[in-house]
Amino acid sequence: MSFSKEAFQVIVLGCSGGPKEDNLSSYLIAPIHSNDFIALDAGSLLSGIDKAYKKGSFKGISEESSNPWQIEPYILRDKVKAYFISHAHLDHVLGLVINSTEDIKKPIFAIDSAIDFLRDHLFNWKIWPNFASEGNPPLLNLYEYQRLELERKIFVPNTEMSVQPFLLSHSRNYESTAFLVESKGFYALYFGDTAPDILEPRKYMENVGKKIAPLVQSRSLRGIFLECSYVDKEESQLFGHLDVKHMMRELRHFACIVNPISPQEALKGLKVIIIHMKGDSLKGDFSKELIRIELDRQNDLGIEFILPEQGDRIEL
């Protein structure tokens, strides 16, 4: 699955599911020729922008800023056009809350449950001032909540992208979201935290797979962001996440949807960015390498797995 040119750029602001608080889930995405981004989750913002800028991952942005000494706040305020929050757990919204005092007016897009949790439990004048457009007064209206309708595509203001949300389950009683990002006929799919279908009463991941299978068949899907929180966990200890075994099971099932006759060929060369890798205080930095080793061992689909580092720039 090769392409003549790349369609998207991704800046990795945070790729971990913890426990370190300065590298939490957040990815900026924009068309390859544009620096007008949306944020897919917002666990780390300014700390990730700082690392990415020092790595040289932002192409051409320094020339746009009138003050090179303030480049990171400029990127946060002026180049991040909107936030798409998959769910309201702290490792996906911490940067949004903490950095709100440095931000400017823009929308937060999320499904109803995520917005309700942000409104009632974070931006509420008890945990944090209410910088948003609903909830406990006074409303500061820095962030405007935009409630997403499932599977309805919306166009993102001040960007060249549209986004279509799909429902996921982070556990039996907690909703999460997948976002299908589109620009000029090309797509990238971002999964928020998700439980494997085998442990859920409804097949949420299968539903997403059926909807996007034609995009793989037409080679217009440029990449998938998919969590792999652990190397290996007992099912009772997954807590609404995927480990390598369950992630590969979902990908094999997806391959069968894309190409029932030759599933082993269906996803060959597809870029899958591994996200939400959780650190282990006992194993130190080896957790990520153990995931990499196990993915290499189990990858019988020819997928191009990408295990990002904070601050990386990835082209899809």
Regions inferred by a protein language model and the residue ranges of each:
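Cap/insert and terminal regions of metallo-dependent hydrolase folds
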Residues: 197-309
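Metallo-beta-lactamase
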Residues: 112-176, 299-314
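Core dinuclear metal-dependent hydrolase active-site scaffold
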Residues: 2-78, 144-217, 313-316
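Active-site flanking residues adjacent to catalytic metal/cofactor-binding acidic residues
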Residues: 40, 86, 190-193, 226, ...
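Short mixed-charge
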Residues: 63-72, 128-147, 253-267
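Short, well-ordered amphipathic alpha-helices
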Residues: 47-70, 93-96, 119-126, 205-212, ...
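Di-metal (Zn2+ and/or Mg2+/Mn2+) metal-binding site signature of metallo-dependent hydrolases
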Residues: 63-104
